[in-house]
UniProtKB/Swiss-Prot annotation:
Pathway: Cofactor biosynthesis; thiamine diphosphate biosynthesis. This is Phosphomethylpyrimidine synthase. Binds 1 [4Fe-4S] cluster per subunit. The cluster is coordinated with 3 cysteines and an exchangeable S-adenosyl-L-methionine. The lineage of its organism: Bacteria, Thermotogati, Thermotogota, Thermotogae, Thermotogales. Belongs to the ThiC family. Zn(2+) binds at residues 269, 333. Keywords: 4Fe-4S, Iron, Iron-sulfur, Lyase, Metal-binding, S-adenosyl-L-methionine, Thiamine biosynthesis, Zinc. It comes from the Bacteria. Pfam families: ThiC_Rad_SAM. HAMAP family: ThiC. Its cofactor is [4Fe-4S] cluster. GO terms for biological process: thiamine biosynthetic process; thiamine diphosphate biosynthetic process.
Length: 424
C-alpha cells in the first residue's frame, strides 16, 4: 500500500511515526493530513529512508538541495560529497538533476547513500540520451517519457518533478505572449520542444492515468512541475503561469482519487509584493496541496548572491504557507555549483525555513529559539554553536578573534549582557 492508502485505512506506518516524533506532533495528525492530501511523505517502496520528511500544512518548512552533474563536470565522488554536505547542514531532501555521465549509476549511488528522500526529473534522461546519440535533445519517442519514469522508480527515487501542465493550449499562449523569457524550466522546455517537433499533446498530460499507475505501484510522490514558471520578476504572475496552474490544480484531484501523493511546484522569480498572492492562490487552486517553491527570488540582480535573495523570498513564502523550499546557491544562473556552493545554499534556505517556522508559531522552532536565548544569557558558547545553522563558521570566527573573559571580542569589557548581569 502507498502511504496515502495506509493513512486512509487508519494504518500508521513506521515513517509516519518517525516524522511525528521529529515534528513533535501526535502521529494521528500526520496520518490525517496525509489521508487528506494536505501533506506528503515521499518514500519509494524500494528506498530505505532513515530520515523521512513530511511536507505540508501544519508542519515545519522543509528544504531541498539540488545536486547533479553537467557536461565537463561529471564526477560521482564530487556529487557524493555534495550530497553529504547538503545533508550535514540540514537539507531535508536531495534532487539528483544530472545531465552528463552515467546518469543511472549516479542516481543509484546517491539513492543508496542518502538517508533522506531523493527526487529527480526523469525527462532529463530522455534528452541526454538523445544528445549523446548525436540527435536533437527532443528527438525521442512518446514511450521514452514513461520508460524513464519507470527507470527512476526502479532506482528508488522518492519524488519526481513531472511537467504535466505544459499543454498545447498553454504552450500556444506562451508563444504569443509578451514574456521576455518565454520558458526557463529545463524540463518544461524539453517537453515543449518535443510537442512542437511532433505536433502532439504532452504525453504526461494526455496519459496522466498511466503516470498515476506507475507512481502508485512504487509509491512515488508526484511533484507537478511548473514548466511555464516565470524566469524573471518582470514576467511574474502572468496569464501563462496561471493557465498552467489551473491545469495542474485539476490533476491534483485525479491523483488524490488514485491515492497517489502529490505536490504543486511554484514560481522561482516573484517580486516580494506578489509572494503572498502566489502562495495563497496555489493553495486554493490545489485545495490545500503541499507547495514546493523554487526560491523564490524577489530580484534578478543578485548574481553571485542569489542564495541571499532566495532566503528573503523563501522566508516570506514560508510564512504565507509554502511548505517546501528548493535552495538556490551562489552559483545560480552562473555555473554548476561546487561543494562550498551547496553548503552556502543549504544554510541560506534553512535560515529562511526557520524564520518562517518562527513566524508561523511552530512550537519546536520557538523552543529552539528559547534555548539559544538562554545560551547567550549564560555565555554557553558550545550550545550556541550547536544551535546555530552555520555551526562551523560561527565557531571559527569566535576562535579567530578570541576574548579571554565572558562575552566576545565584539564588545569585550563593555558587553551589555555582562554589565546588566553585574548591576541587576
Amino acid at each position: 500500500m502507498t502511504q496515502m492508502e495506509m493513512a486512509r485505512k487508519g494504518i500508521v506506518s513506521e515513517e509516519m511515526k518517525k516524522v511525528a516524533e521529529y515534528e513533535g506532533v501526535d502521529v494521528e495528525e500526520v496520518r490525517q493530513k496525509i489521508a487528506e492530501g494536505r501533506a506528503v511523505l515521499p518514500k519509494n517502496k524500494l528506498h530505505r529512508v532513515s530520515k523521512p520528511m513530511i511536507v505540508g500544512e501544519g508542519f515545519s518548512v522543509k528544504v531541498n538541495a539540488n545536486i547533479g552533474t553537467s557536461q565537463g563536470f561529471s564526477s560521482i565522488e564530487e556529487e557524493k560529497e555534495k550530497a553529504r554536505v547538503a545533508i550535514e547542514y540540514g537539507a531535508d531532501s536531495l534532487m539528483v538533476l544530472s545531465t552528463w555521465g552515467d546518469l543511472r549509476e549516479i542516481r543509484r549511488t546517491i539513492v543508496e547513500m542518502s538517508p533522506v528522500p531523493v527526487g529527480s526529473v526523469p525527462i532529463y534522461d530522455s534528452a541526454v540520451k538523445s544528445y549523446q546519440m548525436k540527435k536533437n535533445v527532443v528527438d525521442f519517442s512518446e514511450k521514452d517519457f514513461f520508460d524513464m519514469v519507470i527507470a527512476h522508480a526502479e532506482d528508488g527515487i522518492d519524488f519526481m518533478t513531472i511537467h504535466v501542465g505544459v499543454t498545447r493550449r498553454v504552450l500556444e499562449r506562451v508563444k504569443n505572449s509578451k514574456r521576455i523569457l518565454k520558458i526557463v524550466s529545463r524540463g518544461g522546455a524539453i517537453i515543449a520542444g518535443w510537442m512542437i517537433k511532433n505536433n502532439r499533446e504532452n504525453p504526461f498530460y494526455e496519459h496522466f492515468d498511466e503516470l498515476l499507475d506507475i507512481a502508485k505501484e512504487y509509491d512515488i510522490t508526484l511533484s507537478l512541475g511548473d514548466g511555464m514558471r516565470p524566469g524573471a520578476v518582470v514576467d511574474a504572475s502572468d496569464s501563462q503561469q496561471f493557465e498552467e496552474l489551473f491545469v495542474m490544480g485539476e490533476l491534483v484531484e485525479r491523483a488524490r482519487e488514485k491515492e497517489v501523493q502529490v505536490m504543486l511546484e511554484g514560481p522561482g522569480h516573484v517580486p516580494l509584493n506578489e509572494v503572498e498572492m502566489n502562495v495563497k492562490l496555489m493553495k486554493k487552486v490545489g485545495k490545500g496541496v503541499p507547495i514546493f517553491l523554487l526560491g523564490p527570488l524577489p530580484t534578478d540582480r543578485a548574481m553571485g548572491y542569489d542564495h541571499i535573495a532566495c532566503a528573503i523570498g523563501g522566508a516570506l513564502a514560508g510564512y504565507y504557507g509554502a511548505d517546501f523550499l528548493c535552495y538556490v546557491t551562489p552559483s545560480e544562473h552562473i555555473s554548476l555549483p561546487d561543494v562550498e556552493d551547496v553548503r552556502e545554499g543549504v544554510i541560506a534556505s534553512k535560515i529562511a525555513a526557520v524564520v518562517a517556522d518562527v513566524a508561523r508559531g511552530n512550537r519546536k522552532a520557538w523552543e529552539l529559539e528559547k534555548r539559544m536565548a538562554l545560551a547567550r544569557k549564560n555565555f554557553d558558547w558550545e550550545t550556541m554553536f550547536d544551535l546555530s545553522l552555520g555551526r562551523d563558521i560561527a565557531k571559527k570566527k569566535y576562535e579567530e578573534r578570541p576574548y579571554p573573559d565572558k562575552g566576545c571580542s565584539m564588545c569585550g569589557p563593555f558587553c551589555a549582557i555582562k554589565i546588566a548581569e553585574e548591576f541587576s
